[in-house]
Amino acid sequence: MADNKKSPETGGITMQIPGKGRTNRDWWPDQLNLKILSQNSPLSNPLGQKFNYRVEFSKLDLAAVKQDLRDLMTSSQDWWPADFGHYGPLFIRMAWHSAGTYRTFDGRGGASGGEQRFPPLNSWPDNVNLDKARRLLWPIKQKYGQKISWADLMILAGNVALESMGFKTFGFGGGREDVWEPQEDTYWGSEDTWLGDKRYSGDRELEKPLAAVQMGLIYVNPEGPDGNPDPVAAARDIREVFARMAMNDEETVALIAGGHAFGKTHGAGPASHLGPEPEAAGIEEQGLGWKNSFGTGKGNDTITSGIEITWTPTPTKWSNNFFRVLFSYEWELTKSPAGAYQWKPKGEAGAGTVPDPHDPKKRHAPGMLTTDLALRFDPIYEKISRRFYENPELFADAFARAWFKLTHRDMGPKTRYLGPEVPDEDLIWQDPIPAINHPLIDDQDIALLKSRILASGLSISRLVYTAWAAASTFRGSDKRGGANGARIRLDPQKNWEVNEPEELANVLKILEGIQHEFNQNAPGGKRVSLADLIVLGGCAGIEQAAKNAGYSVTVPFTPGRMDAVQEQTDAASFAVLEPMADGFRNYAKRHLPMKPEAMLIDKAQLLMLTAPEMTVLIGGMRVLNTNFGQTKHGVFTDKPETLTNDYFVHLLDMGTEWTPVSETEDLYEGRDRRTGEIRWTGTRVDLIFGSNSQLRALAEVYACSDGKDKFIQDFVAAWAKVMNLDRFDRIQ
């Protein structure tokens, strides 16, 4: 046996690090990533499955936390001194960058989860020195423990920062639960270098679902597109990425101007003075990064973005001064000590009007970013900016509302908000649903309605298809969508191709007739919503399909959904929920950004499904004949609308040989190996459950002779889970 080698770093024995060798993904980079269906497992959560954050938060003295935060704002620490004696601007940036990763296309990113604590976000170039902000918060987090999550505390700190500098915020809702590991489901881009921008094509068309111009930035490059200091070109980037975060032009101007009413940027010297980011820093740094060798490494020697400006004469006080400075001077391009593009008033204008952050004897001229000047030189932004400049109260209200939206956009409906500062006003971006205002149906009513639905002439497949179409819009990322509200009958969902509008209209007409008859005759003001009836129709269909297979099951159903109206529904906002692909219905548009099977995994993750739940749902929905357009692809049974495990049995049958029948290899024929006769057709989504080793292992469970009962039970449980994903009203 060879002698053990000494480690040059530790002087100890060289050890093999578990998981450090070449991984399966290294060998097979196109392999499906099923790990995203098991992230945030209870096994990684130190608080245990019995922990209830809503209960813990209810014990929190929010006023006391806010007072501690206010005290912290002006308690400058030697290890990271506060600019202008106030940490408020730093905490605003921290909260902004926590929430600002949100994007509308898939609802991922945002403040919920406190992901800024983990890679890659904790080490993004745009988040330089926010590690210090979180360390400043640690004594407060330590004091209140699990009564307030990091995710909530970071946003609350931003709110208190604003309030402590004289701004009246719109409100605060708690309820963001921390995650305990990096989130692998979020696609941040394909670049392999920080600040790379391979995400563009054509005429600067930004890849979906991304909402930042470069890898490692929150929004835009403050120096201008690709570092080109062109304010008008910067406006195009700003408009695009802010729209992808659900912000219109007014909200965009309000956020930029409101955020830049405070604080300064930092570029005292070249970025070459900064050490590695937190995830690459030495163990002795204890999770901090960007150690600065320039001067003292802090205070006036701080390096963050590389830009060195202060926007206004009052950097720790709410005012309209950002607009006053923006419009009062003519601007000329200059460079920071770090070599970054920035703007100063022409000549010596403005000199001595802005305080120094650490030396009361020094004064400076104000400065602007290229992206700030976009608010003056883009004609649409300029008109809004001047209106805000001339109407300070209008600006303050717009910023308060936009900040609230920024920091709460990924939380879902208002029923999820916690605490005494939740605003009473319903906002359309919260996707409001009317409160229950009538007695709910009971078990006897449910049985009666099921019988009427089954006698209506609607097929099992159509009932199941419609219920799935309503519920499967849900996204666990930003808690939007779902069956509650019955928005499937409203624009835009009623016209989505995947929902088969003509068939959908017929189903809704029949269900509305059943609803009307019941509500007209039910005693005591009892009523059933269309949202409940749509879900109940799916339950009835599945129970009948199980009965067809010789099983008696009851699909769990809890009434209480309500019907939203068109005025409560922002059609443009809901448009992003339209699926490009839904493997559960064997639906896919042309020119997908990923292979259909990868789109299935993405959809399953947004539906908060595990790999076994996804697998059993696919098998069940295929035999229930719920394909888009009623195609037979993947319907591996001669008994459609009968809830059997036939899909798995026939998929894994070695008597079938599969061959592609399209150039794009998205459709396959399964032929009898002996006779050559066509048995089945299937899509990539169907065949992946026999091809992928992990999914095949799951499929085998349900294909076994003793897997029939388990298949029925697991399908019903997974179905009920999807139908109730948006029932936040049940956790009150």
Swiss-Prot record:
Protein modification: Formation of the three residue Trp-Tyr-Met cross-link is important for the catalase, but not the peroxidase activity of the enzyme.
Gene Ontology, cellular component aspect: cytosol
NCBIfam families reported in the protein's UniProt record: cat_per_HPI, PRK15061.1
Active site: 97 (proton acceptor)
Lineage, opening ranks: Archaea, Methanobacteriati, Methanobacteriota, Stenosarchaea group, Methanomicrobia
CDD domains hit by this protein: catalase_peroxidase_1, catalase_peroxidase_2
EC number: 1.11.1.21
Region annotation Disordered: where it falls in the sequence: 1-26, 344-365
Protein name per the record: Catalase-peroxidase
Site (Transition state stabilizer): 93
